[in-house]
């Protein structure tokens, strides 16, 4: 402790070179770092560890639910399934138009908040998909570019 105090006083007065101390500290840090690296790459540690075999192919099954809601209360079930990353086909043809619109607005908001998508399949039939599923409609794209009857050949 007395040595530290003496060093501080000498440093304050500028009587001792700081370069020697910095070099000593750097050398100590290099030696400690080399010891840590040696411990990490010690061959006995590597041989004792067993490798893990991980299957690249995962067997996740995607579920598609087909629901025909009878009232507005079905919105909670639909949104819970969407949160569980399930694809839902919703048939709203049997609902009154005002209730169907409210239900559709609720589902669209939940889908947007979860990063999913809501697409109309047919009048009153919608597909709600989570963010990890992409829905494409190649027929719709083909019809928009070519037309229904291609008379311009």
Curated annotation (Swiss-Prot):
Record InterPro entries: Cell_div_SepF, Cell_div_SepF/SepF-rel, SepF-like_sf
Complex and partners: Homodimer. Interacts with FtsZ.
Reported function: Cell division protein that is part of the divisome complex and is recruited early to the Z-ring. Probably stimulates Z-ring formation, perhaps through the cross-linking of FtsZ protofilaments. Its function overlaps with FtsA.
Taxonomic classification: Bacteria, Bacillati, Bacillota, Clostridia, Eubacteriales
Keyword Phosphoprotein: no
GO terms for cellular component: cytoplasm
Name of the protein described by the UniProt record: Cell division protein SepF
Organism: Clostridium novyi (strain NT)
Gene Ontology terms describing biological process: division septum assembly; FtsZ-dependent cytokinesis
Pfam families attached to this UniProt entry: SepF
Keyword terms, alphabetized: Cell cycle, Cell division, Cytoplasm, Septation
Cell location: Cytoplasm
Stated family: Belongs to the SepF family.
